[in-house]
Amino acid sequence: MSTFVELSTKAKMPIVGLGTWQSPPGQVKEAVKVAIDAGYRHIDCAYAYYNEHEVGEAIQEKIKEKAVRREDLFIVSKLWPTCFERKLLKEAFQKTLTDLKLDYLDLYLIHWPQGLQPGKELFPKDDQGNVLTSKITFLDAWEVMEELVDEGLVKALGVSNFNHFQIERILNKPGLKHKPVTNQVECHPYLTQEKLIEYCHSKGITVTAYSPLGSPNRPWAKPEDPSLLEDPKIKEIAAKHKKTSAQVLIRFHIQRNVVVIPKSVTPARIHENFQVFDFQLSDQEMATILGFNRNWRACLLPETVNMEEYPYDAEY
């Protein structure tokens, strides 16, 4: 079983990466160092996580120790949609690059498709509490991001939380220079994303799954929300393979050729989440897990639900 997916640029993207969303400052640096020691080579970051400087420190320390070379790492970051305007985009990108202490990114994604009004807040609001949108769209941002590729600052571009209509608009954009190589979306057995994955793969676009364990630590979780890690069927499959529920949930994506970025700051779990290449789920087990789908999302971004371009209004 390959530990990489090949992107349309021919670059190899490690199929398991470390997610850093909601990794608290003070813990994320250690988490990245532990991950690199455990064999991870793909680290998923974002401007909006407000922790890239610590991730950068960890990467630098590991490179200095000769534990890893920069060219063996695959570092991803994301542009937040308050920065779609050219000048702000270049500044946001430069901040990411400086914080990560790198001279290039392997992959740069548009974090969310809806353009938001520039400002210090992630969700700029008016006095009534309505989120303020921008007339500058993800297509405008894409052109500026293409320049970053041409300048050698970014190896490839992608999107996150886009539906297939939005991806189609990038693919059909007149004068497109660089196609998106991945769409990073929430994906787990309660949200199997079969149609979106099929669409992306048909266009030569990989899919990256975030919240592969169902985002159990999200701050807005409700007691009645379903829990994947506690699901008896998942536990049963895990016991059969002498693995944990988390390992089964990660393996599920690998066998669909979907890149997966579990987040943890706990050293034992970081190691555990990478021990997923020494077993195989049967076709029957895969079918059982796919049968869990209920189109349930942990991450809805409710702030923007009534705005144009809300990505989850479409079926896929």
Swiss-Prot record:
GO terms for cellular component: cytoplasm. Transmembrane segments: none annotated. Substrate binds at H111. InterPro entries: AKR, Aldo/ket_reductase_CS, NADP_OxRdtase_dom, NADP_OxRdtase_dom_sf. Keywords: Cytoplasm, NADP, Oxidoreductase. PROSITE patterns: ALDOKETO_REDUCTASE_1, ALDOKETO_REDUCTASE_2, ALDOKETO_REDUCTASE_3. Detected at very low levels in urinary bladder, testis and jejunum. NADP(+) binds at residues 211-273. Induction: By FGF-1. Up-regulated by calpain inhibitor I (N-acetyl-leucyl-leucyl-norleucinal/ALLN). The record marks K78 as: Lowers pKa of active site Tyr. PANTHER family: ALDO/KETO REDUCTASE. Monomer. This is Aldose reductase-related protein 2. The lineage of its organism: Eukaryota, Metazoa, Chordata, Craniata, Vertebrata.
